[in-house]
Swiss-Prot record:
The protein's name: Putative defensin-like protein 101
Source superkingdom: Eukaryota
Keyword Zinc set for record: no
Location(s) in or outside the cell: Secreted
Protein family (similarity comment): Belongs to the DEFL family.
Amino acid sequence: MDITKNIVTLLLVVLFPILFYYNNVLAFPASDQSIYARCIGPCPRYAVPHWCENECLSRKYMAGGECAFIEGEGPTPRCCCINL
């Protein structure tokens, strides 16, 4: 019983911070929205790091992209490609 309890506790201590990190660190408020060429769609809730950058690079935006909250676009972050 003790070993099961310890394993479950360890999983919770390790798993929840990882999920929380990936869910919250991917998007931020965009202060200068003029750098974005266009937003290509919403960022997945549990996207891997650099998901948006890779999507923009595959669409020939050489500066990449980032997940950002855009004014007037609702409460979900958008994948916006950078126009430099």
